Amino acid sequence: MGGEELSEFEKQRLANIAERDALLKKLTQDAQSVGLFPPKMPKGASPAGDKAKKKKPAPKKVKKEEAAAAAPVPRRMSSRLRGIAAESEVAKRKADEHDAALQEAERAKRMRKSDSFSLSEMLVSGQKLSGESLLGVDVVTKGVAMPYQRTFSDEDIKKTTDKDLKALREEMSGLGLWDAWEPNRIKLTPERIYAMTFHPSESKPLIFAGDKMGHLGVLDASQTKPVSAATHDEDEEDDDDDPDPVLTTLKPHTRTISCMTIHPSKPTHLYTASYDSSIREMDLEKTTSVERYAPASTADDVPISGLDMALDDPHCLYWTTLDGEFGRYDMRTPRQDSATRWTLSDKKIGGFSLYPTHPHYFATASLDRTMRLWDLRKLSHKSPVAVGEHESRLSVSHAAFNGAGQVATSSYDDSLKIYDFGAKGIASWKPGHSLSDAQMKPDVVVRHNCQTGRWVTILRPQWQQNPQSHIQRFCIGNMNRFVDIYSGSGDQLAQLGGDGITAVPAVAVFHRSKNWVAGGTASGKICLWM
């Protein structure tokens, strides 16, 4: 760059540097002349005035401990460079392995078991069963439960003008809570009750309840409190003399028992359906349980939401799933040959039932907000078409048929709807018959709080299949901690309650023919009115 001519910028920069150096040199000379600081001394020279050298201080003695501490230490090196895994990584790996093991254990616990079970293999707690012992109106405020506040009372009965209706109201309202034990002491299942049924026997009330984790509870309500306990009821300090009722808890399923039924012609067999994708048959005489239907692979997850059987056929099972399927299976033939399935909805079917006297008709309730009526005689697998459908404002929880051809539904739009297909001539319809939207409108709509929330089982109507009078009636749980009973025309017949009911008896069921009503709660406890 020596031969190159400097630019104007470079010339100016060099001039500034030279000017700054000259200024600094002048300032230094001026400061020395007035004695602000002495001039620099040659290396090794002492100031002129310091003739005597200063005495050096004696070297400080260093203790052995300090010397050891001052010794050179090994150079720090990271665990990564030394080939050692970091503690956080080891802990994370152990935590991941632990979580994976827990998930696998939970998956295995929830996977259905296809084996046949004996009583000892199913028994969780309580008394061992034997075949001999086994057989022998309106909620005004939407979404707000008002515990113990009645919406139907004796005043409503007194105001009734219809003689038959008044007599039935008096009869149903006269049902009393089973007083041998308070409801909060009758814990039939460990977890929340999802399904219940009575044994069809009229000799004694025998109740079955299924819970969230696949437990099956059994209660014989013909038992009486021991005399020793009855005489000590008033002695609060002597709890040992007041035993709980005799209950039995079994575990035939690994997941929620969603539905159960006993065919009247086979009273010794209880059928249970579960979210573990299986339907099992429990022989009440032999106290054994066998799998009657399930998908081919245990890895297939097809939760079953409903189960029913035709009155004239004790060999055929009908069910619905949370995937929107409807199935039929004849237990006398191999499952792979006779199990038939239809996809009836894109969303889950929460409940269904067959028309008892004409079981080729059935009604479904779906999350897609519809209640649909179907005819098995004209049900295509490729594109099934319903006889008719009615759409509610919100999802429909259940659709229950009675022997008179009426369907009762419960819906999240806070209503109970009754569709009277019997009055429309359903018994004489030919295959292919269809109903218009106008014909599918409900005949009766009753306001009812159905906002169960997360912890209460969904409210579902359940008819008495063989009522003792010509008036049809069904029961359903009430969020105010009652069980309501309605007639087929929508008239409220009773509101059953009592002392000691501390939770909503959400799962309510009628005995087939006797005026016995049971209600199950989220804590696994039951109430019984007789």
Curated annotation (Swiss-Prot):
Gene3D superfamilies noted in UniProt: YVTN repeat-like/Quinoprotein amine dehydrogenase (2.130.10.10)
**What is an example of a Pfam family matching this protein?**
WD40
Cysteine pairings via disulfide bonds: none
What's a BP term from Gene Ontology annotated to this protein?
A: regulation of DNA damage checkpoint
Q: Does the keyword Repeat apply?
A: yes
Q: Which UniProt keywords apply?
A: DNA damage, DNA-binding, Repeat, WD repeat
- Where do Acidic residues bias regions lie? 233-244
The record's SMART domains line, in alphabetical order, gives: WD40
Instruction: Enumerate composition-biased segments (Basic and acidic residues).
Output: 89-108
GO cellular component terms, alphabetically, are: chromatin; cytoplasm; nuclear periphery
- Which regions are annotated as WD repeats? 188-229, 252-292, 302-339, 344-384, 389-430, 453-496, 499-530
Positions of the UniProt region annotated as Disordered: 34-115, 224-250
The molecular function terms of the Gene Ontology recorded here are: DNA binding
Q: Which SUPFAM superfamilies match?
A: WD40 repeat-like
Q: Where is the composition biased (Basic residues)?
A: 52-62
Function comment: DNA-binding protein that binds to both single- and double-stranded DNA. Binds preferentially to UV-damaged DNA. May be involved in DNA-metabolic processes.
Which family is this protein grouped under?
A: Belongs to the WD repeat DDB2/WDR76 family.
- Family annotation (PANTHER family): WD REPEAT-CONTAINING PROTEIN 76
The name on file for this protein is DNA damage-binding protein cmr1
Query: What is the species of this protein?
Result: Aspergillus terreus (strain NIH 2624 / FGSC A1156)
Lineage, uppermost ranks? Eukaryota, Fungi, Dikarya, Ascomycota, Pezizomycotina
